[in-house]
Amino acid sequence: NSWFAHGATVPMLGGISRDSLSSEWNLYNILYTFMPVFWAYLTGYFLKILIGTGSFVLLAKDVYQKAYPRYRGIAWAAGLCYGLLPLFPAYGIAFASIPLAVFILRRIYRKEGKWWYALLFVYPFLSYFSYFGFFLLAYLVCAVVIVSIRDKKFCGRLAVAVPVLAAGYVCFEYRLFGQMLFSDVKTIRETMVESNLNFSGVLGQIREAFLTPVFHAASDHAVFVLPVCVIVLVWQLVAAVQKKNLKKFKSSTLLWVLLLIVFNCLVYGLYFQGDFRGLFETLLPPLKGFQFNRTVFFNPFLWYAALFLALKALYDTGKLFWKRIANLAACIAAAVILLTPAVYNEFYWT
């Protein structure tokens, strides 16, 4: 069986090296190793829903602690919406597990025990470095800096998490790193001609990333989730102005999640500007041809985290009417996903 072999030729595309394909130590790949294709696909599809929903709820429970029971319903609803998103099947589990990574890192930050480092090390079993790992590590380094400044002391716990997570990716995707670092094989992306857009073209790409699904990240947010989040954010701003408490608005979690979405969209747009892309490749030569605009792959999770925060704001009014509106909004958000004819939306097409 060439699946576990090294230096073997795989009978596809006229014959390519097995080492050029993804690692065998990945949950989604393992499904196809031991199951018929149809059942492996279905199992992976439903695992994506289970992992996406479960990890989202775990994160919400960890963040809100004793207050979590108050938001349990909308946490499950928003998590289910995230799990149902018709994301690229081969990496659907990697998309779905993003909240799990955040959950583990929060436990590490709070000194919950050394075994959380072990869980972080094996996390790449669910993930994929080229789509998510590189950016998780970059975000984690930023978190170390920000938390250290905020706490006025170096955050060693999260700093240690950086090499632990990196080592996990190297071990679980050893073929990828072997090809990248110890092989003279050139990737097709090194020779691909990328767009070099002007200012208006870059703005168009940023707008597209903010409003529509990009690549394999079909978040289905523009129809309903985006308007709900913007309306609630404006409502929070108006309330803060009326109470002369803009400081509270500036600390709004919803605001910062939406700003992170905008940042990811900015990076996506700037990728299509030749000088900016050239600067990135000059600073990091081994990553020449790497699509660093994949920051947008984190936006599906961020959009439904923003939805949860918007619904939570309605719950926090303490009024039954707004709670019912929040519950209705959660149902509509799920219906939009199920009824959208997206490429990988098996619930719609079947």
Regions found by a protein language model. Give the residues of each.
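Signature aromatic-anchored transmembrane alpha helix within multi-pass, membrane-resident enzymes
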Residues: G73, A313-E346
